């Protein structure tokens, strides 16, 4: 199915015919859907659960992959609870995959994107065959100062690729082969194109970097390290203020 923002028409026919239940699907039903649409040949355990989506460990012809599935009805957003979101969850999966693709093509350290089907998409697995790469929040760093420098460089790398992570925190950075890898770009900001007025897009991106710097600062203080937020903002702004409006 092409990566456009619309669900397959058969989904709507099934809704109208009463063939689709509006209860959140079980793990078995999700696994069946992942296999049937060709995103993986084997579906294992759920690796994690976020505000709107769940992540599953899968295999595709033996190779480890990850599949992210946006929940259709159950989210942590109060306004969304109980609503029917077949269209919007497909749109959100599309948006995140697009941001991941732009970042990856721009050389940022993010999982290699796969493909999307409706509210699900696949991407690169990070870790060993025995264990997934840990979140920074749960990792013990042997060289924290070096890792902090790599993280700052990674944030700049995302900006150079035209993407700013708007939910940057130790929970959205994985430690893989001693380096930071950025995940969960669902609410990221594109800064390499027109659309919104440039000043509005710039301010949104800068506020995102400020929040991320505070979150990372709280984490690295456990190692008696400080995140130089003003310097990070200055360097990121220089990369994303394409129209010199800031």
Spans of model-derived segments:
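C-terminal/domain-terminus segments
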Residues: 2-15, 136, 233-246
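Short, glycine/acidic-enriched loop or turn micro-motifs at the edges of active sites
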Residues: 71, 127, 170, 175, ...
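Surface-exposed, interaction-prone regions with an acidic/low-complexity signature
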Residues: 13-21, 25-26, 70-73, 139-143, ...
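Conserved ATP-binding subdomain of kinase catalytic cores across diverse folds
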Residues: 22-132, 156, 160
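Ferredoxin-like alpha/beta domains used as RNA- or RNAP-binding modules
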Residues: 1-40, 139
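C-lobe/activation-segment region of protein kinase-like
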Residues: 147, 159-165, 176-246
């Amino acid at each position: 199915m092409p990566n456009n923002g619309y669900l397959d028409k058969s989904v709507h026919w099934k809704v109208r015919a009463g063939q689709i239940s509006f209860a959140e699907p079980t793990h078995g039903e999700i696994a069946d859907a992942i296999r049937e649409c060709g995103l993986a040949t084997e579906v294992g355990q759920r690796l994690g659960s976020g505000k709107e989506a769940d992540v599953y460990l899968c295999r595709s012809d033996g190779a480890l992959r990850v599949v992210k599935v946006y929940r259709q009805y159950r989210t942590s957003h109060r306004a969304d609870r109980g609503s029917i979101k077949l269209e919007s969850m497909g749109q959100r999966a599309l948006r995140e995959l697009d941001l991941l693709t732009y970042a990856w093509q721009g050389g940022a350290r993010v999982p290699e994107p796969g493909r999307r089907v409706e509210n699900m998409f696949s991407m690169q697995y990070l870790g060993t065959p025995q264990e997934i790469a840990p979140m920074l929040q749960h990792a013990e760093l042997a060289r924290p100062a070096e890792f902090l420098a790599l993280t700052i460089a990674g944030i700049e790398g995302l900006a150079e690729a035209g993407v700013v992570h708007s939910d940057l925190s130790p929970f959205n950075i994985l430690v893989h082969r001693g380096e930071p890898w950025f995940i969960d770009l669902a609410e990221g900001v594109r800064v390499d194109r027109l659309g919104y007025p440039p000043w509005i897009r710039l301010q949104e991106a800068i506020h995102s970097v400020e929040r991320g710097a505070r979150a990372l600062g709280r984490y690295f203080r456990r190692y008696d390290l400080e995140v130089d937020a003003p310097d990070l903002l200055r360097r990121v702004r220089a990369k994303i203020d394409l129209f010199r409006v800031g």
